[in-house]
Amino acid sequence: MHWIKCLLTAFICFTVIVQVHSSGSFELRLKYFSNDHGRDNEGRCCSGESDGATGKCLGSCKTRFRVCLKHYQATIDTTSQCTYGDVITPILGENSVNLTDAQRFQNKGFTNPIQFPFSFSWPGTFSLIVEAWHDTNNSGNARTNKLLIQRLLVQQVLEVSSEWKTNKSESQYTSLEYDFRVTCDLNYYGSGCAKFCRPRDDSFGHSTCSETGEIICLTGWQGDYCHIPKCAKGCEHGHCDKPNQCVCQLGWKGALCNECVLEPNCIHGTCNKPWTCICNEGWGGLYCNQDLNYCTNHRPCKNGGTCFNTGEGLYTCKCAPGYSGDDCENEIYSCDADVNPCQNGGTCIDEPHTKTGYKCHCANGWSGKMCEEKVLTCSDKPCHQGICRNVRPGLGSKGQGYQCECPIGYSGPNCDLQLDNCSPNPCINGGSCQPSGKCICPAGFSGTRCETNIDDCLGHQCENGGTCIDMVNQYRCQCVPGFHGTHCSSKVDLCLIRPCANGGTCLNLNNDYQCTCRAGFTGKDCSVDIDECSSGPCHNGGTCMNRVNSFECVCANGFRGKQCDEESYDSVTFDAHQYGATTQARADGLTNAQVVLIAVFSVAMPLVAVIAACVVFCMKRKRKRAQEKDDAEARKQNEQNAVATMHHNGSGVGVALASASLGGKTGSNSGLTFDGGNPNIIKNTWDKSVNNICASAAAAAAAAAAADECLMYGGYVASVADNNNANSDFCVAPLQRAKSQKQLNTDPTLMHRGSPAGSSAKGASGGGPGAAEGKRISVLGEGSYCSQRWPSLAAAGVAGACSSQLMAAASVAGSGAGTAQQQRSVVCGTPHM
């Protein structure tokens, strides 16, 4: 049996392996191809000829298709191998082709849809190339000397399904409609067509297949391959070759093979397993053929005789009175001396005229037809519960010599039967039955059987029209509406449930209540809001908003007032905005105070933000201006220090440097460009004009006349001759205190007043020792210094000379030539010869 199963399994596996050769196919169904202009993918005419005037192609295309199916590619390579296959069709038409008529193209060897069978598990993705070519010589190669009309590239995820997926591709000149799908071959199932299942009903299996390819056994078959039949239900010791069959194993029998076969020759026995013999009661022996209880099995004694087993299948019978024989089969009809029918010393008397032919006179204490019954007397105490009385035999109960008087609850000849006076129970309504049959009634009932319900309403009166209802050992008052309590003495207060809504006041009435409503509400329970808008109080197109005990009018543009009966003097825009916001807020259920608060905040918050922005802007601007002012003052202070340095040096070189720095606007815009080796000069990179050193008092008047021609703020540079005079009005303009945080040039050597020795030409050119002997002037000196020292210059209001004249003055001073008048002329720009 085992080798048959192995052979069956091997055959099935071999069949499955051999038949897995193709699992499904990809199908492409071409439907419509349109190329109305007869052009290729580059816009050229397929025929190569066109109308010169209209540009219309004169000829038509001869269209064939090439289809290539391959594995999924993120970027489709049109030149690589078609891994799933490719198909080249014959010429199917000209410019436009209707491919839905499959019968039309069968003669050309073209089958639509185009199928690409595969013998692997479908991966779920694909790449498809569909090309339309123009063929001029109807060759088999679609790409040789042909023109490409259209190329379609498709890459998609596609599941196995019998439904077609419709697509359409359009280009500048062409369009193509097509369908595609993937289906499994017959007997292949699953998402990849990889599960094989073939229906069969033969010796190798009996099954069908589900939609997913699972094996489903036919009725009556089971097993992995549905090759095992299901035997009849209850078949215990059997097998089957067909469904619902039960072929018994050796030693079993019956429809369900549940009966064992007895040992051969077993007569009076059973079995619980094959080939056994279990003897029935009264039988023994190897085959259960020996009778061990003849009396029980055969009952040989008749006429009431008693049988006794004597062993080995033998027995004896004890006959009842009046009978005789081995089996007590003979009835006695006379007083035979050998067989006396009367027992217990009874005397037999022949009476031929009777049926039995004799009669027995029993001895004292016995009775019965054959004197077989003992006569009892009171001495035997036969009465169990009663009183015993001796009587003559035959007069008592059943011929006995006594008679019993039974007490209540007992009966029977011997008072041994207890009477059940409570069965069935005579007491009703829950009464308790006593052994004597008397009923003890529960409270509320009376009578022999507790059948009477005591009227508990007697002596109890219900008030206010209530009705008394009698109950078991109690009563209940059914009150009329409006009253309650045990005797209906209390009035129902319907106001306890607070039926009045919206603050209404409740007044209790008889079985009713009355609500006194607040202003603005009405109804039985004050739940109805009175619509104050029902009368149309709003005029001039105003919208009425119902309120509690009031109304509110949302006025149209141009009107105001409680009822919109006044013309509005506010702007239309403001009214519309205000009332629109108010309407929306009130529609949202806000109170007037909330609406006002929201309106104030909606206006105030943007205003506060604008004010804060303005304050920040002004503070920044103020800081910027203060910074610029401090920077300007610092620059001015540094420039004055620079001029003072030139005066201190007293040389033509220093003046020339000052002229170059102060008058160099035609050069670079770098401002002051003193020698970087001079530590006493701070360079000015802003190229601003500075206040120069004052000239002599005599030059002040001439400077005032030439002030208009100066480009700077008007000032003079002293000549070398003036420098030689110790009492000259020449001085350095006083320096002002700088308010700027920037560092100033406070070198103490800058502000020494020139002495006669230090102001000589030698000192100017060589820087003699007199330069260090003059009085030191503090950088932070008083502002009145120059005005006290040179009152004439202060009166003229001259601060300095322009940079261009300063250069000329420096030249004259450096050479030592020219008079003071010439020097002044050069400085102020007035030519004097």
Swiss-Prot record:
GO terms for biological process: actin filament organization; antennal morphogenesis; apposition of dorsal and ventral imaginal disc-derived wing surfaces; asymmetric cell division; border follicle cell migration; cell fate specification; chaeta morphogenesis; compound eye photoreceptor development. Disulfide bonds join 46-61, 68-82, 184-193, 197-209, 217-226, 231-240, 235-246, 248-257, 260-271, 266-277, 279-288, 295-307, 301-317, 319-328, 335-348, 342-360, 362-371, 378-388, 383-404, 406-415, 422-433, 427-439, 441-450, 457-468, 462-477, 479-488, 495-506, 500-515, 517-526, 533-544, 538-553, 555-564. Changing residue 800 to R: In strain: sonoma_002. Residues 19-594 are extracellular. GO terms for cellular component: apical cortex; cell surface; cytoplasmic vesicle; early endosome; endocytic vesicle; endosome; membrane; plasma membrane. It is a single-pass type I membrane protein. One of its GO terms (molecular function) is glycosphingolipid binding. Changing residue 787 to G: In strain: nps_6, nps_18, nps_34, sonoma_048 and sonoma_050. Residues 743-773 are annotated as: Disordered. Ubiquitinated by Mib, leading to its endocytosis and subsequent degradation. Residues 618-833 are cytoplasmic. Its main location: membrane. It is found in: Membrane. Detected in all areas with neurogenic abilities, for example the neurogenic ectoderm and the primordia of the sense organs. Later expression is restricted to those cells that have adopted a neural fate. Interacts with Notch (N) via the EGF repeats and the N EGF repeats. Separation of neuroblasts from the ectoderm into the inner part of embryo is one of the first steps of CNS development in insects, this process is under control of the neurogenic genes. Notch and Serrate may interact at the protein level, it is conceivable that the Serrate and Delta proteins may compete for binding with the Notch protein. This is Neurogenic locus protein delta. It comes from Drosophila melanogaster (Fruit fly).
